[in-house]
Curated annotation (Swiss-Prot):
Its EC number is 6.2.1.54. ATP binds at T151, S152, N291, T292, Y293, G294, P295, T296, D382, Y393, N394, G395, R396, K491. The keyword Cytoplasm applies. This is D-alanine--D-alanyl carrier protein ligase. The gene is dltA. Catalyzes the first step in the D-alanylation of lipoteichoic acid (LTA), the activation of D-alanine and its transfer onto the D-alanyl carrier protein (Dcp) DltC. In an ATP-dependent two-step reaction, forms a high energy D-alanyl-AMP intermediate, followed by transfer of the D-alanyl residue as a thiol ester to the phosphopantheinyl prosthetic group of the Dcp. D-alanylation of LTA plays an important role in modulating the properties of the cell wall in Gram-positive bacteria, influencing the net charge of the cell wall. Disulfide bonds: none annotated. The keyword Heme does not apply. Pathway: Cell wall biogenesis; lipoteichoic acid biosynthesis. Its main location: cytoplasm. It catalyses: holo-[D-alanyl-carrier protein] + D-alanine + ATP = D-alanyl-[D-alanyl-carrier protein] + AMP + diphosphate. It is found in: Cytoplasm. It comes from Bacillus anthracis. InterPro entries: AA_adenyl_dom, AMP-bd_C, AMP-bd_C_sf, AMP-binding_CS, AMP-dep_synth/lig_dom, ANL_N_sf, DltA, DltA-like. Keywords: ATP-binding, Cytoplasm, Ligase, Nucleotide-binding.
Length: 503
């Protein structure tokens, strides 16, 4: 697949087809090509001998997509930076990346060591350079970086994950084929562009001549606006975290009647709970549900499985799928040997989807990446096992805690808690006393119940948990809330929860 050429062909074949919609703003494939060409021409004329990455700042504005393509057409990787990212972190990204330029689609942070092109300046560039086309020889290709996404680092400093053109082509081609994506579909874009889940909809949509329907953080905070937008969208391909879908399922009208042409649900970024998938099948009986797995360092996702009722009945904890054909999975034991089928260990991903490492961080790169049989490999830090070719994810190795001498996985407890009657959503928060964990707190969004007192509801939930888990894994305390806080990326905001419950 020639990625950029594939996107550009729609500007010729279906120039008036809408490529991207956000609120009242939208762009066609013709406009996407013209404006990204103009921007690429300007970048190449301003930085003829430079290939440093370019920061792209904003939220869900159509200019974000134009800027991404303009950067790569001019031979520069782009770094998506969302409005929600604090100024201090933006500063550290600018310093670590060596970027010399920031393209802004919104009000911009100031005092950065880069040249800033404002939203108005961008529009001037689109106008004054219209009709100019960049030299296709300058475009990003092969093992050159296409985008760099910054993720959280254990040191407190963000890590820039370098994804090459070849990495992205490998992912996009697999996604289009394995998920049976068709020409001209409408894709939900829920994840901010600084979260690599957004790549799961951006490029599969653009290469198939689809329409990206973006919903922003303000809509998500106002369910009335969110569901009004969804009703207008006619979305056919849904891409989100499971947490976001779980939140939508709390609205009774979120069903086939709201989205009658829904064809495919694509989930990544978190564990897909069995009960969430089951509710989706009930609400959208004609749609296909795909559960996928992959870290940012391996280009969005490397495994997938069609979740059917048979799969739901067979597995209480859902498998995350079969590996894409050009990659392979190894399960490594603590002693460095490969675990046999069915035995747990660390998931290691090998193949062309794997990143070339962290930008400007050779020590971190050496720790997480290696070469196996001449191919790049990434040590994920995730626990899991493979059985009959199917990968089962068992949580982060660093989500395992030791409580009163017992080692346990928090996600396992959450899985069983969510399966209880009277529970709509739940997160386990381990509470420390000094340096050690003292007890487990369950933060629960209750479902329908007739208990007059909270302690009676707690007793009923604990009774069910006692049938599923050993006593030492039962949370000592329960807290009830109307919702679980989420990060801008659509994942459970564990840090915020911890600060709330320990305040």
């Amino acid at each position: 697949m020639k990625l950029l050429e594939q996107i550009e062909k729609w500007a010729i074949e279906t120039p008036d087809q809408t490529a991207f919609v956000w609120r009242d703003a939208k762009i066609t494939y013709k406009q996407l090509k013209e404006d990204s060409d103009a921007l690429a021409h300007w970048i190449s004329s301003e930085y003829p001998d430079d290939r440093s990455p370019i920061m792209v700042y904003g939220h869900m504005q159509p200019e974000m997509i134009i800027n991404f393509l303009g950067c790569v057409k001019a031979g520069h990787a782009y770094i998506p930076v969302d409005l929600s990212i604090p100024a201090d972190r933006v500063q550290r990204i600018a310093e670590n990346s060596g970027a010399k330029l920031l393209l802004s689609a919104a009000v911009t942070v100031t005092d950065l060591p880069v040249r800033i092109v404002s939203e108005d300046n961008l529009k001037d560039i689109f106008f004054t350079h219209k009709g100019n086309t960049p030299n296709p020889e300058h475009a990003v290709k092969g093992d050159e970086n296409f985008y760099i996404i910054y993720t959280s680092g254990s040191t407190g400093n963000p890590k820039g994950v370098q994804i090459t053109y070849n990495c992205l082509v490998s992912f996009t081609q697999w996604a289009v084929e394995d998920f049976n994506l068709q020409t001209g579909q409408v894709f939900l874009n829920q994840a901010p562009f600084s979260f690599d889940l957004s790549v799961m909809d951006i490029y599969p949509s653009l290469v198939t001549g689809g329409t990206l329907w973006a919903i922003d953080k303000d809509m998500i905070a106002r369910p009335k606006d969110l569901f009004a937008s969804l009703e207008q969208s006619d979305i056919q391909v849904w891409t989100s975290t499971p947490s976001f879908a779980e939140m939508c399922l709390m609205e009774a009208s979120f069903s086939e009647s709201m989205l009658p042409n829904m064809k495919t649900f694509l989930f990544c970024g978190e564990v897909l709970p069995n009960e969430v998938a089951r509710k989706l099948i009930e609400r959208f009986p004609k749609a296909t549900i795909m559960n996928t797995y992959g870290p940012t360092e391996a280009t969005v996702a490397v495994t997938g499985i069609h979740v059917t009722e048979e799969v739901l009945d067979q597995y209480k904890s859902l498998p995350v799928g079969y590996c894409k054909s050009d990659c392979r999975l190894l399960i490594m034991k603590e002693d460095g040997t490969i675990a046999p089928d069915g035995e747990k260990g660390e998931i290691v991903i090998v193949g062309p989807s794997v990143s070339v490492g962290y930008l400007g961080s050779p020590e971190l790169t050496e720790k997480a990446f290696t070469m196996i049989d001449g191919e790049r490999a990434y040590k994920t830090g995730d626990a899991g096992y493979v059985e009959n070719g199917l990968l089962f994810y068992n949580g982060r190795l660093d989500f395992q805690i030791k409580l009163h001498g017992y080692r346990m996985e928090l996600e396992e407890i959450e899985h069983h808690l969510r399966a209880c009657s009277y529970v709509e959503g739940a997160v386990i928060v381990p509470i420390k006393k000094g340096e050690k964990y003292d007890y487990l707190l369950a933060v629960v969004v209750p479902g329908e119940h007739s208990f007059e007192k909270e302690f009676k509801l707690t007793s009923a939930i604990k009774k069910e948990l006692n049938e599923r888990l050993p006593n030492y894994m039962i949370p000592r305390k329960f807290m009830y809330q109307s919702s679980i806080p989420m990060t801008p990326n659509g994942k459970v905001d564990r840090k915020k929860l911890l600060s709330e419950v320990t305040a």
